[in-house]
């Protein structure tokens, strides 16, 4: 088995974050990632579609984190942005939005599902996530910036969601959710933090390597791909 590749699939840049896309990408490369997804919130997008920074040997994925409280409008946003994005994230935070995201197979990741006194997930939603291939984001920035009762609540919600993810085989994605270069952490730091938060070593590794790779493979299919269930075969005797 080769050396694993590490990815951070939720990084924000100007005008959503405080650091430029080039700064975030350069630091991500320096930290040892193989790639990051620049995923600004949909209500903080630049006026023009930005040109992604280029660094040889490093992948920069085009992403978005959709923010919409109305499920019907959320589905419209998913349809609007899906085909132009490598990584499509929904910013949760209510039962209606969480359900809309987890029941839609065109969504890659649900971030920030918790609301009120709920962790944001239950058995029904966890089953929907597993059936539709929607991963749950394990977001580090809120944990790093919180203290006291707020951090205790975040860890409690995370524990509840981890139990459901394990029971129903829901994929997890480990993300920094960095709003500036000061929020970025190296892959080794993120793995260590994930284990402190309750993930097993193999779970954390899958969440920062294997699952992101599967998301990109799904959204960037190979040249022989036409549509789901159909593939062009070359160089083979078909009869």
Curated annotation (Swiss-Prot):
InterPro entries: Pol/histidinol_Pase-like, RNase_P_comp-3_arc, RNase_P_p30. Transmembrane segments: none annotated. It is found in: Cytoplasm. GO terms for molecular function: ribonuclease P activity; RNA binding. It is an enzyme of class 3 (hydrolase). The keyword tRNA processing applies. It catalyses: Endonucleolytic cleavage of RNA, removing 5'-extranucleotides from tRNA precursor. The keyword Nuclease applies. Part of ribonuclease P, a protein complex that generates mature tRNA molecules by cleaving their 5'-ends. Consists of a catalytic RNA component and at least 4-5 protein subunits. This is Ribonuclease P protein component 3. It comes from Methanosarcina acetivorans (strain ATCC 35395 / DSM 2834 / JCM 12185 / C2A). The lineage of its organism: Archaea, Methanobacteriati, Methanobacteriota, Stenosarchaea group, Methanomicrobia. The gene is rnp3.
